Design a protein with these regions (language model features):
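A short beta-strand-loop structural module common to alpha/beta enzyme folds
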Residues: 34-46
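Glycine-rich, basic loop-to-helix element that forms the pyrophosphate-binding segment
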Residues: 44-58
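The conserved acidic donor/metal-binding loop of glycosyltransferases
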Residues: 67-71
Length: 139
């Protein structure tokens, strides 16, 4: 596993949004020694199938799963996530949604969703960064 590699796995069905998403990824300030890889997911049967395929193609320790219309405007957001993982060694996933307990079903609806919002956002957004590989499945 590539310890200092970060894979951005992005579902794409609109190239204009994807290009803007890439613009912000390319402006991120990654910690020294870290590299970014981008895995666009196009024409997958489902978002879950697409994420699983891209996850298996990458050996990056950290994988950022996101939609094409998410723009990472805070240039240090990856550093914040890496610091969070360092401070919380048992954490394996962080992002827009989270839970205070583990569900064997891996279903947010059964796991008790909680969230902490750093900034107000409008619209539907999806960004999750994982330190460990977990298969995605339909809820």
């Amino acid at each position: 596993m590539a310890d200092k590699s970060i894979a951005f796995i992005i579902c794409v069905n609109d190239e204009t949004y994807f290009e803007e998403c890439l613009f912000y990824i390319n402006r991120l300030r990654l910690p020294d020694g870290y590299i970014a890889e981008v895995y666009p997911v196009r024409q997958a049967e489902s978002i879950f199938q697409g994420y699983n395929m891209a996850m298996q193609q990458s050996d990056a320790q950290y994988k950022v799963y996101m939609h094409q219309d998410v723009f990472l405007i805070d240039k240090d957001i990856i550093r914040y996530f890496l610091e969070l993982f360092e401070q919380q060694p048992k954490a394996g996933i962080a992002g827009v949604l989270g839970t205070n307990r583990y569900s064997n079903e891996r279903s947010f609806s059964e796991a008790g969703i909680w969230a902490m919002c750093w900034d107000a956002v409008k619209g539907k957004h999806f960004t999750i960064i994982c330190r460990k590989n977990r298969l995605w499945r339909r809820p």
